[in-house]
Amino acid sequence: MEQIQMVKVLEKCQVTPPSDTTDVELSLPVTFFDIPWLHLNKMQSLLFYDFPYPRTHFLDTVIPNLKASLSLTLKHYVPLSGNLLMPIKSGEMPKFQYSRDEGDSITLIVAESDQDFDYLKGHQLVDSNDLHGLFYVMPRVIRTMQDYKVIPLVAVQVTVFPNRGIAVALTAHHSIADAKSFVMFINAWAYINKFGKDADLLSANLLPSFDRSIIKDLYGLEETFWNEMQDVLEMFSRFGSKPPRFNKVRATYVLSLAEIQKLKNKVLNLRGSEPTIRVTTFTMTCGYVWTCMVKSKDDVVSEESSNDENELEYFSFTADCRGLLTPPCPPNYFGNCLASCVAKATHKELVGDKGLLVAVAAIGEAIEKRLHNEKGVLADAKTWLSESNGIPSKRFLGITGSPKFDSYGVDFGWGKPAKFDITSVDYAELIYVIQSRDFEKGVEIGVSLPKIHMDAFAKIFEEGFCSLS
């Protein structure tokens, strides 16, 4: 059978919605919220579960149940079985389309690995390539149809580590969903697999709404975003679908509530009589990681390429704005509904004695500017793409995930995950932040860096906390 690094593929199959699904054909328009993500086909989540059972039990029981529950989940998430249709000719807009007659489905890979399960799920340094071997490489284009390129939306790989564990690796095209929506889909699949039925999805808040009419384009953003994305889409259309290779390692850092409070106390002491700033778990965590990252870069660059202390550094993140639209979007709206936020501060400020205060204040200010704009969250949205595109990559750090997501609540019937990972961060200068598995109100921070940079980051991260003791 096919080999992907140290993973043996046992089966490749297509999973469709059940035959009694009402929607035989379904088409959804792309909204202006979706357009900035049309080039990103790798939103990846990786869940590890302890599962001390033999390979035979996995193949005879687990896989049939997962196939059946995934199919039943797709009855309620039909568009995920379909594709993104990207126009070949100008003048047309992309759209999402599902057709039973075309055989639209989700690819499911069943695999086996002899890798060290404890190593892969650990918080210590892990070679990024070892994790990506657990993902099916979803093709960028599967066929052309009339005047459209047909691009798949979701793929799943389930890998067994006999007598040790299971890894569930999900890949989604970002254009169909933001992280909040995709986590809802994963939870719905896990819920149905655990309980064997879909009757209670509504009461579990896992029934999605695909009603695109909710999104009102009051500022002509569709045209603006579509025009600004053309060069990006052209560049990404030339990329292939080969398995990625990274010169990076991964590490997970955990902050307990007590450690977060220590950071908050430091900021409050530094603030003194300065105006009130937003001191939350999110701003504290991101502010601390941002300052550590900027300082660690100084440790690994040569003197000749040292940083200009007056240059700006940028921290980019997105915020769910479903409840801030006019009219508000329901919490179960399935799609992208994200506002772009960018914090900025000079290099000198971030590495200085008050660097943490500066970082937290800048992130809080970006949140206030975007989400609490008196004119509305979309009032200045026409500048979002140009603002982000103008950021130098060496001055950029972004974040995905959220400490609000209950990532460790995804229970397929095997208990909560031993580890939840977001491997998409390997593709850019990104970190992720999610709820901690083991500490109530704590967080986990996933970092992906070249080894020499990771060593410098880890040293600064740990020393920062030692200074708080």
Curated annotation (Swiss-Prot):
Main subcellular location of this protein, as a coarse class: cytoplasm
UniProt catalytic activity: an anthocyanidin 3,5-di-O-beta-D-glucoside + (E)-4-coumaroyl-CoA = an anthocyanidin 3-O-beta-D-glucoside 5-O-beta-D-[(6-O-(E)-4-coumaroyl)glucoside] + CoA
Tissue expression profile of the protein: Expressed in the outer epidermal cells of petals, but not in sepals, leaves or stems.
EC number(s) from the headed UniProt entry: 2.3.1.153
Activity modulation notes: Activity enhanced by manganese ions and inhibited by p-chloromercuribenzoate.
A Pfam match: Transferase
Record-level Gene Ontology MF annotations: anthocyanin 5-(6'''-hydroxycinnamoyltransferase) activity
InterPro entries documented for this protein: CAT-like_dom_sf, Plant_metabolite_acyltrans
A cellular component term, taken from the record's GO annotations: cytoplasm
Disulfide bonds: none
Keyword tags: Acyltransferase, Cytoplasm, Transferase
Enzyme class: transferase
Post-translational modification remark: The N-terminus is blocked.
Active site per UniProt: H174 (proton acceptor), D411 (proton acceptor)
Locations listed in the record: Cytoplasm
Entry's family note: Belongs to the plant acyltransferase family.
Further information: Cannot use malonyl-CoA as a donor.
Function text: Transfers hydroxycinnamic moieties to the glucosyl groups of anthocyanin.
This protein's name: Anthocyanin 5-aromatic acyltransferase
Organism: Gentiana triflora
